[in-house]
Amino acid sequence: MRQIAIYGKGGIGKSTTTQNLTAALATMGNKILLVGCDPKADSTRMLLGGLNQKTVLDTLRSEGDEGVNLDVVVQPGFGNIKCVESGGPEPGVGCAGRGIITSIGLLENLGAYTEDLDYVFYDVLGDVVCGGFAMPIREGKAKEIYIVASGELMAIYAANNICKGLAKFAKGGARLGGIICNSRNVDGERELLEAFAKKLGSQLIHFVPRDNIVQRAEINRKTVIDFDPESNQAKEYLTLASNVQNNTKLVVPTPLPMEELEAMMVEFGIVEL
């Protein structure tokens, strides 16, 4: 069982990428559990045809410990992917990071991590790797980390910060598998992210081009893999899935000092002096 966490700054398309990646892996015959670790609870929506899933924390609040069972919090989605949303605290109360810790602990106790699973994916809110959101890394749950980024300053800044957290908790066994580019059609984007990944000691695992079919699929509450499996974009996600499946390059990243990061952005014309 490979346990993989997907990080990336808010709004980068992390949940969209994760759902299309897991859908592609499922069509390749893999058995998958996807745990959404974002208080917005939107990590599984397209796999469930738009169904707003009841979260682990909502169930805990309304039913108590006794009311939480796998039938309530685990829903089968596209490709028979087991879908879970950890949820978050009520707005303004409590810590969402603690919620992830509670949810994963509950899933373990309830026996969600069955031996027949090929993959467990964690879709994690990742602008800031605070203690709770770092939990899949820190506790050694996820051994493989992929970061979704684009050729924009804040996306790369967030990716570098995530690598700082990953390097700090490397003793738990977590390693960076690579950078996934979710393209924003920025000039020189592929070359920039290849250079950034190389400086980290890692790789650009795949460059996912921008295509409006992603939005059309989302409007229809489906992944691209489900909505139009013959499309070019579906083939891109299948290539990403194949690259992840065959990836053996797992490293402790070397985050860039801020001066070097800014110099690289200037070199590629993303930032002007």
UniProtKB/Swiss-Prot annotation:
It comes from the Archaea. PROSITE patterns: NIFH_FRXC_1, NIFH_FRXC_2, NIFH_FRXC_3. The reversible ADP-ribosylation of Arg-98 inactivates the nitrogenase reductase and regulates nitrogenase activity. Binds 1 [4Fe-4S] cluster per dimer. PANTHER family: LIGHT-INDEPENDENT PROTOCHLOROPHYLLIDE REDUCTASE IRON-SULFUR ATP-BINDING PROTEIN (PTHR42864:SF2). HAMAP family: NifH. The key enzymatic reactions in nitrogen fixation are catalyzed by the nitrogenase complex, which has 2 components: the iron protein and the molybdenum-iron protein. Homodimer. This is Nitrogenase iron protein.
